[in-house]
C-alpha cells in the first residue's frame, strides 16, 4: 500500500512540475500574421501566365545570362560565407541540445609525495581512477526553450542565405542587362557616327561646288565630334559592368574574359506575363519575410528562457572510483570512492534583475513583430511597384519602337531633300538629333523593361528553394569549362 501511495505522489509531483514549465511568449504563426496584412488581390492588373518564379533568369531566353547566374550562385564568396554562418547556427543548436543530456567524465590520478606531517609516513604512493556523472534536469523548460531559440536562429540564417542568393541573382541579372545596354549604346553611337560622317562628307562636297556653306560644314563637324566624345565613357561603363559580374562570380576583374561576356548581344527580353500568385502567397515565399518571422520566434523563445530564471535549478551529481595508497612499506590499501549529491538553487533577492531581463526580452519580441509587419508592408509595395513598371515598360517599348521607325524615315527624307536642295542642313541636323534621341530612348526603355522584370521576380521571392528542416543548401562550384 505504501509503495502505491509513493508512486501516486511521485506521478503527481512530476505532473505538477510539468505544469510549471515555462512556454515561449505567445504569437501568431506566419500564415496568420500574413493574413492580417496581405490584401485579397493586387491593385495593379498584369497579364498572368503559368510562368514560375523559380530559376526566373532562365525565362529571359538568354543562355549567357542563365549560365552567368548559375555560376555566380555557385561560386560567389558571400554565399559561401553565408553557408558557413548557417552551419555555425546549427552547431550552436547542437550545443544547446547537449545541455539537456547528462554528462559523463572519466578521471585518473597518480601521486608520489613525501608526507612529514605527524605521524610521518615517508613517501606515499597514490593512484586512482573514477567516473563522474552530472545532470541538470530541465524541470521548468528553460534549456528546452534555449534549444528552440537556437533552432529559430538556424531558420533565420537559412532564410538570410536564401535572401542573399535571391539578391545576388537579381544583381547579376541587372549587371548583365546594364552590360548589354552599354554595348547596344555603343553600337548606336557607332551607327550614328557613320551617319554623321556621311553628312559631313556631303557638306564638304557641296561646299566645293558652292552648294553649301562653311557654317554647314562646321555644324556637321560639331555634331560628329560631340557624338564621338561619348564613346570613351560608354566603353568605361562596359568595363565596369564586366568587372562587377566577375567579382560577383568570385573572380578577379582581370579574368572577366573567362565568362565569355565581352561579345555584344541584345538586351534580354522578359516574358510579357507575371507569375500567378496571391499577395499572401508572395509574402510567404519571400525570404526576408521568413527571416523576420524567424526573429520573432527566436525572441519569443528567449522570453521563455528569461522567465525560467525565476524558478529553482537542480543538479544531480554521481561519482564512483578506486583509490590505491601505499606508504611505510605496508601493503597497498584500496578504497572505493562513491558519492551522490543533489543540489538546488533558487533566486530569492536580485534587486529586480530577473524581472528587468524578462521585460527586456518581451520588448525585443514586440520590436521584432513590428519589424515583421514593416517588412511585409515594404514587400507589398515592392511587388505592386514592379508590376506597374513591367506593364508600363512594355507599352513604352512598343511606342518608342514606332517613334524610332518614324524618325529613321524622317532622317532619310531630310537627307534626300538636302541633296536635292529642297531643304537646309538644319533640317538634316534636327533629323539626326531626333533619330539618335529615339534610338537611345528605345535602348533605355528596353533596359528599364528588363530591369523591371528582374525586380518583379526578386520582389516575388523567386529564385530559391526552401530547404528541408536542418539541411544547409549546398554550394557547388561551377563547371564552367572556359573558367577552368
Residue ranges and their predicted role:
Residues 207-211, 418-422, 459-463:
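A short glycine-centered flexible hinge/capping loop motif at secondary-structure junctions
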Residues 3, 143, 159-278, 389, ...:
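Periplasmic alpha-helical coiled-coil/stalk elements that build and connect Gram-negative outer-membrane
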Residues 122-126, 333-337, 438:
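Transmembrane beta-barrel outer-membrane domains
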Residues 111-115, 241, 321-325:
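Structural signature of outer-membrane beta-barrel domains
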Residues 2-74, 151, 235-284, 290, ...:
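Terminal intrinsically disordered/low-complexity segments used for targeting and assembly
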Residues 80-81, 97-98, 137-165, 215, ...:
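Sec/SRP-type N-terminal targeting helices
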Residues 127-135, 175, 278, 338-342:
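Hydrophobic, lipid-facing positions within transmembrane beta-strands of outer-membrane proteins
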Residues 21-171, 313-318, 348-358:
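Short flexible linkers and secondary-structure junctions
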Amino acid at each position: 500500500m505504501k509503495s502505491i501511495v509513493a508512486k501516486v505522489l511521485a506521478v503527481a509531483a512530476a505532473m505538477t512540475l510539468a505544469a510549471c514549465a515555462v512556454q515561449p511568449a505567445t504569437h501568431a504563426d506566419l500564415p496568420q500574421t500574413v493574413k492580417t496584412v496581405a490584401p485579397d488581390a493586387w491593385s495593379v492588373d498584369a497579364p498572368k501566365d503559368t510562368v514560375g518564379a523559380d530559376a526566373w533568369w532562365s525565362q529571359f531566353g538568354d543562355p549567357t545570362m542563365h549560365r552567368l547566374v548559375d555560376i555566380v550562385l555557385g561560386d560567389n564568396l558571400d554565399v559561401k560565407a553565408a553557408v558557413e554562418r548557417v552551419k555555425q547556427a546549427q552547431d550552436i543548436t547542437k550545443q544547446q541540445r547537449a545541455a539537456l543530456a547528462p554528462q559523463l567524465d572519466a578521471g585518473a590520478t597518480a601521486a608520489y609525495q613525501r608526507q612529514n606531517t605527524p605521524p610521518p609516513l615517508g613517501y606515499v604512493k597514490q593512484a586512482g581512477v573514477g567516473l563522474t556523472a552530472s545532470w541538470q534536469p530541465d524541470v521548468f523548460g528553460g534549456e528546452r526553450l534555449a534549444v528552440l531559440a537556437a533552432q529559430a536562429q538556424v531558420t533565420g540564417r537559412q532564410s538570410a542565405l536564401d535572401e542573399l542568393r535571391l539578391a545576388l541573382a537579381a544583381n547579376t541579372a541587372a549587371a548583365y542587362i546594364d552590360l548589354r545596354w552599354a554595348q547596344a549604346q555603343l553600337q548606336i553611337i557607332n551607327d550614328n557616327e557613320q551617319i554623321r560622317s556621311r553628312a559631313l562628307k556631303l557638306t564638304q562636297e557641296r561646299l566645293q561646288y558652292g552648294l553649301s556653306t562653311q557654317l554647314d560644314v562646321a555644324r556637321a563637324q560639331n555634331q560628329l565630334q560631340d557624338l564621338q566624345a561619348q564613346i570613351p565613357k560608354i566603353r568605361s561603363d562596359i568595363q565596369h559592368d564586366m568587372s562587377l559580374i566577375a567579382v560577383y562570380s568570385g573572380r578577379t576583374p582581370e579574368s572577366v574574359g573567362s565568362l565569355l561576356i565581352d561579345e555584344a548581344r541584345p538586351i534580354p527580353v522578359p516574358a510579357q506575363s507575371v507569375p500567378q500568385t496571391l499577395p499572401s502567397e508572395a509574402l510567404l515565399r519571400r525570404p526576408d519575410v521568413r527571416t523576420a518571422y524567424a526573429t520573432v520566434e527566436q525572441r519569443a523563445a528567449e522570453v521563455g528562457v528569461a522567465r525560467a530564471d525565476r524558478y529553482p535549478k537542480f543538479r544531480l551529481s554521481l561519482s564512483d572510483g578506486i583509490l590505491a595508497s601505499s606508504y611505510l612499506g605496508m601493503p597497498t590499501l584500496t578504497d572505493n570512492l562513491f558519492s551522490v549529491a543533489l543540489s538546488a538553487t533558487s533566486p530569492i533577492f536580485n534587486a529586480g534583475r530577473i524581472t528587468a531581463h524578462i521585460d527586456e526580452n518581451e520588448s525585443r519580441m514586440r520590436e521584432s513583430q513590428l519589424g515583421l509587419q514593416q517588412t511585409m508592408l515594404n514587400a507589398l509595395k515592392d511587388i505592386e511597384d514592379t508590376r506597374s513598371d513591367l506593364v508600363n515598360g512594355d507599352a513604352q517599348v512598343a511606342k518608342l519602337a514606332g517613334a524610332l521607325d518614324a524618325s529613321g524615315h524622317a532622317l532619310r527624307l531630310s537627307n534626300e531633300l538636302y541633296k536635292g536642295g529642297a531643304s537646309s542642313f538644319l533640317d538634316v541636323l534636327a533629323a539626326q538629333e531626333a533619330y539618335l534621341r529615339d534610338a537611345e530612348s528605345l535602348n533605355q526603355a528596353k533596359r528599364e523593361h528588363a530591369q523591371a522584370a528582374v525586380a518583379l521576380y526578386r520582389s516575388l521571392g523567386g529564385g530559391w528553394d526552401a530547404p528541408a528542416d536542418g539541411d544547409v543548401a549546398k554550394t557547388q562550384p561551377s563547371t564552367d569549362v572556359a573558367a577552368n
